Amino acid sequence: MNTEFLKNTFSKVIKDYDTARPGYPKELYDKVMSFSGIGKDAAVLEVGAGTGQATDLFLQGDFRFDLLEVSEEQVLFLKQKYGNNPKVTVVKDYFEQYETEKKYDLIYSATAFHWVDSWVGYPKAWEMLNTGGTLAVFWHMSSVTYYEGGIFDGLNALKKKFLPGESLGFDAEGILKVKERRVAQIQSGGCFGAPEIYEYRWTDTYDAERYVTLLNTYSGTQTLSEEKRQRYLEEVRKYIVVNGGRVELPQHVMLYLVRK
């Protein structure tokens, strides 16, 4: 599947993404703050701001923000959301191509840096940071994790029916390999050392409607034809309704922190 196509699928489902995707825990923000030590008016860059879920968390700090996004739709959404905040600037550009004389005290990316070529992205982040500056990259893992038992068995069966070529997700060993790969990518180019890694877990309760909305934000779902996508979502909705009406979805976020 074309990477550019997958990057831009999210611009089609902005409102669904903002409604249904899980946010990030305050503990993550607190850890980034304690690690970075940044203070008022620090220069902060967010790579791949999406709908601003992580932005909302970091805005509790009195910093100066540049938000980077690639699609016109998402840039417009962010400008409408933060247009009245004089400390927020929204920029339409790819991180690999982004040029500025500015140096940053913190660069962070929330479930987005995998879209950036690691051999370009991590050395570029190093160059864009002030000495002592922090890079914080973190990802939600629930969308790529294999869950089984209970309601998940039926959800997995429906996914195999409509998306037979798509993985059901990583098991514990697979998640560990993802972690190891990301550590290696952070160190690619010989700039950053080994990151500090922190993990956050909780459980979200989704009713049928919100779970279907979440499912609609996944790039695999968006590759389906309109007719097939609607049938898939409707079958999932009906399945959840007749099986208790809710999904207890484990959430898992991995945070990687490095300093220049």
Show where each model-derived region lies.
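A short acidic, Gly/Pro-enriched loop at the edge of an enzyme's catalytic core
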Residues: 97-107
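Class I SAM-dependent methyltransferase SAM/SAH-binding core
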Residues: 43-45, 50-98
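Tryptophan-centric aromatic hotspots in well-structured domains and transmembrane helices
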Residues: 12, 17, 24, 31, ...
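Conserved class I S-adenosyl-L-methionine
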Residues: 1-39
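Conserved Class I S-adenosyl-L-methionine
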Residues: 51, 172-260
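Conserved catalytic/acceptor-binding region of the Class I
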Residues: 132-201
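A short glycine-rich, Lys/Arg-flanked "PGG" loop and its adjoining helix->strand segment in the class I
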Residues: 120-133
